[in-house]
Amino acid sequence: MNINLTLIGQAIAFAFFVAFCMKFVWPPLINAISERQRKIADGLNAAEKAKADLADAQAQVKQELDAAKAQAAQLIEQANRRAAQLIEEARTQAAAEGERIRQQAKEAVDQEINSAREELRQQVAALVVTGAEKILNQQVDAEAHNAMLSQLAAKL
């Protein structure tokens, strides 16, 4: 056997094998590798986008949380102001009611004083009439002297 002829035969077989692999085996492998690279790149891009979206969502959540806290603080402040206003209104109403009750009591006391004075005047007038009857030993007509007794009672 000749080594040169074997070597040439092997080289030709190897060339056919390489041509066959380049024609039928290599393109699917390159496509699979390209597809895998594309999927990995897409996955990395999606991960970066998801990371950016997560950061945006966290910023938005923080912003909404801050807004909710501010709104809650505003509502609490508004409720406190309303409570203070209601307390002040209740104080004003209580003061007005107290003043009204005091005024009614004063009017009732004044009325009682006037009633007592009038009753006292009538009693004094009756005593004066009785005293005058005893002094004069005669009956004094109360209706005839009513004006005089009224003047006397008014002076008392």
From Swiss-Prot:
One of its GO terms (molecular function) is proton-transporting ATPase activity, rotational mechanism. Its main location: membrane. It is a single-pass membrane protein. Keywords: ATP synthesis, Cell inner membrane, Cell membrane, CF(0), Hydrogen ion transport, Ion transport, Membrane, Transmembrane, Transmembrane helix, Transport. It is found in: Cell inner membrane. One of its GO terms (cellular component) is plasma membrane. Coiled coil: none annotated. The chain crosses the membrane at residues 5-25. InterPro entries: ATP_synth_B-like_membr_sf (IPR028987), ATP_synth_b/b'su_bac/chlpt (IPR002146), ATP_synth_F0_bsu_bac (IPR005864), ATP_synthase_B_chain (IPR050059). F-type ATPases have 2 components, F(1) - the catalytic core - and F(0) - the membrane proton channel. F(1) has five subunits: alpha(3), beta(3), gamma(1), delta(1), epsilon(1). F(0) has three main subunits: a(1), b(2) and c(10-14). The alpha and beta chains form an alternating ring which encloses part of the gamma chain. F(1) is attached to F(0) by a central stalk formed by the gamma and epsilon chains, while a peripheral stalk is formed by the delta and b chains. F(1)F(0) ATP synthase produces ATP from ADP in the presence of a proton or sodium gradient. F-type ATPases consist of two structural domains, F(1) containing the extramembraneous catalytic core and F(0) containing the membrane proton channel, linked together by a central stalk and a peripheral stalk. During catalysis, ATP synthesis in the catalytic domain of F(1) is coupled via a rotary mechanism of the central stalk subunits to proton translocation. NCBIfam families: ATP_synt_b, PRK05759.1-2. Belongs to the ATPase B chain family. This is ATP synthase subunit b.
